[in-house]
Amino acid sequence: MAVQQKIRIKLKSYDHSLVDKWALKIIDVVKQTDAIIFGPIPLPTKTHVYTVNRSPHVDKKSREQFAFSSHKRLIEIINPTARTIDMLMKLELPSGVDVEIKS
């Protein structure tokens, strides 16, 4: 039984539509190379809440909260070819999307 190679691509962004759009573009590129693909798998959204004082030095009771949601998608590619990797390397992702690739 041969060992299957796989690549995991994790996309992160504060904008969910940007993550979904680029996940679909990556899937379209990989489908052209006849590799098996799973995804995009939505991972849990993390919300980061930051609390700051409204006043510079007094009124501790007066605060303001800011929240940022971090959206993630996971794409798995099974048995990638050299052509698959070349096409993935040629993709130019926008600055708002963070990409993490593991093999």
UniProtKB/Swiss-Prot annotation:
InterPro entries named among the record's database cross-references: Ribosomal_uS10 (IPR001848), Ribosomal_uS10_CS (IPR018268), Ribosomal_uS10_dom (IPR027486), Ribosomal_uS10_dom_sf (IPR036838)
One GO cellular component term noted in the UniProt record for this chain: ribosome
Pfam families assigned: Ribosomal_S10 (PF00338)
GO biological process, one term: translation
Gene Ontology MF, one: tRNA binding
Keywords: Ribonucleoprotein, Ribosomal protein
Residues spanning the signal sequence: none
SMART domains: Ribosomal_S10
Function summary: Involved in the binding of tRNA to the ribosomes.
NCBIfam families in the record: PRK00596.1 (NF001861), rpsJ_bact (TIGR01049)
Family named by the database record: Belongs to the universal ribosomal protein uS10 family.
Subunit structure: Part of the 30S ribosomal subunit.
Name of protein: Small ribosomal subunit protein uS10
Protein source organism: Chlorobaculum parvum (strain DSM 263 / NCIMB 8327) (Chlorobium vibrioforme subsp. thiosulfatophilum)
Gene that specifies this protein: rpsJ
